[in-house]
């Protein structure tokens, strides 16, 4: 705790021009005294006073041009093992863009449901809120800074949803009136959106608190969504013409929304997630009839959770094949017509999806 408080104080001294140095030092020392014990207060005062006098030598960061890994580890505050993976796939400049985005405040997007985005934007502007259309047929609005989503949700039916997640539902492209099982549903944004795209959705998840939030959202915005408490490995449904698996994943495409996640993730937990995803896929495959679709989705950037997982599944299940619908612009698709949204290219949260059709 003492180290964390010192880090916060140092950050205020070095990077927050709006906080006077004396205030950063005194407030941090007070917090140390009240939260970490009186004994730590003199140490905190001495460390921060020294930092105030000497300043932080930002030139001590390894140069990006010659040492991108070391630079991005220190300056960008990302774990080296994760950066090594990214530098093995993308250029140093692309990885730096991703790191910068992960460290920046996340924008807030609103997806109106039952109301066209243009109409929702006009209504919000009439109420004094700033909102902008995105283009590319993405049904989300970018909200201006300072907009309170909680107040907005009381005025216009919809959900807070990043365009990356919205593109997953567009890519799934359910036919009107189709029965769809969302087996990893909570907190339910995709289930609600798919219902408003015309599907009859069975939303299953083992988390009761998160399902309560989903039920409240269904009551608020409407939609043909039936909520069930169940594990994806034990599907609460028989044969279903469309199954969505928005599986638990490492979430490396959404690190800007969860700043601590980069430090909690380890290679071991990544391997455990890959095993879990494989089990969920295997459990869901028998539910899909001939001509039906299995949509596998994540919010991670990691190859073994995305392309690798789909490749392994198709090798075991030759009765399935990739089936793209043309429902999203080509710029969001990879060479195999799978959905791939990269934050460093789009500014959106990362997303991946593959639409798999069972042959007749």
Which ranges hold each PLM region?
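S-adenosylmethionine
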Residues: 1-360
């Amino acid at each position: 705790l003492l180290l964390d408080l010192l880090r916060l104080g140092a950050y205020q001294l070095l990077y927050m021009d709006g906080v006077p140095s004396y205030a950063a030092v005194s407030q941090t020392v007070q917090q140390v005294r009240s939260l970490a014990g009186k004994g730590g207060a003199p140490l905190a005062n001495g460390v921060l006073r020294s930092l105030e006098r000497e300043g932080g030598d930002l030139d001590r960061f390894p140069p990006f041009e010659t040492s991108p890994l070391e630079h991005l580890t220190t300056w960008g505050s990302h774990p080296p093992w994760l950066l090594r993976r990214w530098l093995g796939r993308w250029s140093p400049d692309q990885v730096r863009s991703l790191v910068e985005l992960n460290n920046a405040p996340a924008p807030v997007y609103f997806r109106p449901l039952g109301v066209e985005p243009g109409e929702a934007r006009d209504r919000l502007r009439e109420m004094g809120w700033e909102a902008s259309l995105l283009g590319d047929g993405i049904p989300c609005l970018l909200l201006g800074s300072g907009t309170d989503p909680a107040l907005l949700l009381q005025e216009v039916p919809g959900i807070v949803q990043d365009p990356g997640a919205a593109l997953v539902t567009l890519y799934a492209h359910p036919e009107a009136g189709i029965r769809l099982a969302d087996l990893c549903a909570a907190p339910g944004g995709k289930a609600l959106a798919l219902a408003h795209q015309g599907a009859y959705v069975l939303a299953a998840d083992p988390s009761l608190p998160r399902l309560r939030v989903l039920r409240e959202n269904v009551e608020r915005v409407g939609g043909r969504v039936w909520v069930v408490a169940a594990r994806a490995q034990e599907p609460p449904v028989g044969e279903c013409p469309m199954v969505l698996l928005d599986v638990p994943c490492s979430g490396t495409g959404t690190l800007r929304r969860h700043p601590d996640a980069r430090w909690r993730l380890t290679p071991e937990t990544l391997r455990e997630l890959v095993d879990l995803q494989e089990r969920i896929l295997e459990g869901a495959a028998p539910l899909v009839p001939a001509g039906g679709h299995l949509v596998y989705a994540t919010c991670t950037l990691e190859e073994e959770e995305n392309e690798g997982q789909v490749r392994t599944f198709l090798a075991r299940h030759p009765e399935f094949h990739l089936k793209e619908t043309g429902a999203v612009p080509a710029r969001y698709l990879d060479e195999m017509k799978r959905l791939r949204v990269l934050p460093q290219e789009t500014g959106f949260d990362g997303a991946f999806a593959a639409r798999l059709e069972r042959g007749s």
